[in-house]
Swiss-Prot record:
Keyword terms, alphabetized: GTPase activation
This protein's name: Rho-GTPase-activating protein
Subunit structure: May bind to Rho-GTPase.
UniProt source species: Rattus norvegicus
Superkingdom assignment: Eukaryota
């Protein structure tokens, strides 16, 4: 999944 800041989890 991708957070709002664009960081991939």
């Amino acid at each position: 999944l991708f957070e709002e800041n664009g960081g991939a989890l």
